[in-house]
């Protein structure tokens, strides 16, 4: 029996090869795999000796040979194939263990284009696909985690079962598809082409979820193959607590996205059902958290918390005072972990030091939404710099009002449309979102904020279609307003702001969120 081993991921390689030899397999290999096996004293033959054809073009052509692919693809149940293989001296290959050149890792390292191109595997995918196609006669192993199961079946049954071969086949085609998708994505990025004519996405399963958004829905969590430099939920380390749910992950991502709007100072964000119910910044993290929680303590119960500085004991103690679903932060002090360990179901996620950096920013990537029969892609929304804002009222905002408008505008982008946000310079005061008309969003925010809205800034994610929403905001006590503008009634809105003595700024950019 012949087995061909050629792997870039050498985890478990030597024990697997030793097990195959014990079972009577003769091994073929190339390059670094060959050297690793020889170095471990495993008997192995060079592929070029088997094919009687040298490796050429600096190793670009090693396994692309009839004695390899004929041995893999031969349909042994067909007499014609067997006779043809015999005539050409082709021996069947019954097991192929291959994983591909480290293309993704090379891209992630920042390597130059020529080096990346050399890591586009040709022979490997050809062998994997050929082996998977002929799964009735060939076991194809692309994942070292499958080595023990394959060896166990060979030892117990003298063969790999059809069920296992079918499972390995599916895994193999998924492996090559993801590999090609990564190459395609890199080439599109190199060309500055965000929306290619053909789109392939490559993700790997992080975990099966207990269920989806609701218990009757199935769910799973997938992530990119390589961890980005920016902080993410997908690559955060879970330190304690219950298994993450589908809704936890969505809310954690929403919390992290909003938190990254405030990298310069300690900040706290509380999210409930993908909606901000508390946001604050302060010189001390514990004060930021307490201020954020005080915005809406009822909604904060059972919420998701995101923090952008290491969690200290004081902040941990403050969080332990109420029921929370999950917390994501750059890190936790030993004392904080000791405090939070008493909350055994509380999920603690560590996003890493990048989240604590004053230069932390959201990752520049596309947002995807599935629709029936297709998918929508768009650039991730961003907040334009205040330099592009235009004062249109008679009265210019004071420095304090300008700071409050900046804060409100950053938060407003993260509230479902129609979105209205009242804020001071360092905290959310109230928000109203998800309504089908803007004046109702204003009124909901007013009901939540009450007297705290006096002297506040109000932000609207899109223009006010009528002055009624602005009139209500003024009645609530807002002294300044930031909005995109662009309504046919802009002049009427500006006049209303002047009538109320409000400062009005137009950003020229809308931030709908659906």
Curated annotation (Swiss-Prot):
Gene3D superfamilies (alphabetical): 3.40.140.20, Methylglyoxal synthase-like domain
Pfam families found in the cross-reference section: AICARFT_IMPCHas, MGS
UniProt entry tagged with the keyword Hydrolase: yes
Enzymatic reactions: (6R)-10-formyltetrahydrofolate + 5-amino-1-(5-phospho-beta-D-ribosyl)imidazole-4-carboxamide = 5-formamido-1-(5-phospho-D-ribosyl)imidazole-4-carboxamide + (6S)-5,6,7,8-tetrahydrofolate; IMP + H2O = 5-formamido-1-(5-phospho-D-ribosyl)imidazole-4-carboxamide
SUPFAM superfamilies per record: Cytidine deaminase-like (SSF53927), Methylglyoxal synthase-like (SSF52335)
Domain of life: Bacteria
Disulfide bond entries: none
Assigned keywords, A-Z: Hydrolase, Multifunctional enzyme, Purine biosynthesis, Transferase
PANTHER family: BIFUNCTIONAL PURINE BIOSYNTHESIS PROTEIN ATIC (PTHR11692:SF0), BIFUNCTIONAL PURINE BIOSYNTHESIS PROTEIN PURH (PTHR11692)
Protein name in the entry: Bifunctional purine biosynthesis protein PurH
């Amino acid at each position: 029996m012949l087995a061909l081993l050629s792997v870039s991921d050498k985890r478990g390689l030597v024990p697997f090869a030793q097990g195959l030899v014990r079972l009577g397999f003769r091994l073929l290999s190339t390059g670094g795999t060959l050297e690793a096996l020889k170095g471990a004293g495993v008997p192995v033959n060079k592929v070029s000796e088997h094919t009687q054809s040298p490796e050429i073009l600096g190793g670009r052509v090693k396994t692309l040979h009839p004695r390899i692919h004929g041995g893999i693809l031969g349909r042994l149940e067909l007499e014609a194939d067997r006779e043809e293989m015999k005539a050409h001296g082709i021996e069947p290959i019954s097991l192929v263990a291959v994983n591909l050149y480290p293309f993704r890792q090379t891209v992630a390292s920042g390597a130059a284009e020529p080096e990346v191109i050399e890591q586009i595997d040709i022979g490997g995918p050809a062998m994997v696909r050929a082996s998977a196609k002929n799964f009735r006669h060939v076991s194809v192993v692309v994942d070292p985690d499958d080595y023990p199961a394959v060896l166990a079946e060979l030892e117990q049954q003298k063969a790999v079962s059809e069920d296992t071969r079918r499972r390995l086949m599916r895994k193999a085609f998924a492996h090559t598809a993801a590999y090609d998708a990564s190459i395609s994505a890199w080439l599109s990025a190199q060309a500055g082409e965000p929306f290619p004519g053909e789109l392939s996405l490559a993700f790997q399963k992080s975990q099966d979820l207990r269920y989806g958004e609701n218990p009757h829905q199935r769910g799973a969590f997938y992530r990119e193959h390589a961890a980005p430099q920016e902080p993410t939920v997908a690559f955060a380390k879970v330190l304690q607590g219950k298994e993450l749910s589908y809704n936890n992950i969505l809310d954690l991502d929403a919390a992290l996205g909003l938190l990254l709007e405030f990298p310069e100072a300690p900040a706290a964000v509380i999210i409930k059902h993908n909606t901000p119910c508390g946001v604050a910044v302060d010189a001390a993290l514990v004060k930021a958290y307490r201020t954020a929680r005080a915005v809406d303590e009822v909604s904060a119960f059972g919420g998701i918390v995101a923090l952008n500085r290491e969690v200290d004991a004081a902040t941990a103690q403050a969080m332990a005072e109420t029921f929370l679903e999950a917390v994501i932060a750059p890190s936790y002090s030993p004392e904080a972990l000791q405090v939070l360990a008493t909350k055994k179901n509380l999920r603690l996620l560590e996003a890493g030091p990048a989240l604590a950096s004053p230069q932390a920013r959201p990752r520049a990537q596309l947002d995807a939404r599935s629709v029936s029969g297709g998918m929508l892609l768009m650039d991730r929304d961003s907040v334009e710099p205040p330099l592009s804002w235009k004062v249109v009222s008679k009265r210019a905002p004071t420095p304090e009002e300008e700071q409050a408008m900046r804060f409100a505008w950053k938060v407003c982008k993260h509230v479902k449309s129609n979105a209205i946000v009242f804020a001071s310079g360092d905290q959310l005061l109230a928000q109203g979102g998800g309504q089908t008309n803007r004046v109702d969003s204003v009124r909901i925010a007013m009901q939540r904020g009450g007297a705290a809205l006096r002297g506040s800034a109000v932000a609207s994610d899109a223009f006010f279609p009528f002055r009624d929403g602005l009139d209500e905001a003024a009645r609530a006590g807002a002294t300044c307003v930031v909005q995109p503008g662009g309504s046919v009634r802009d002049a009427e809105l500006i006049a209303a702001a002047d009538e109320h003595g409000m400062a009005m700024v137009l950003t020229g950019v809308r931030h709908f969120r659906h």
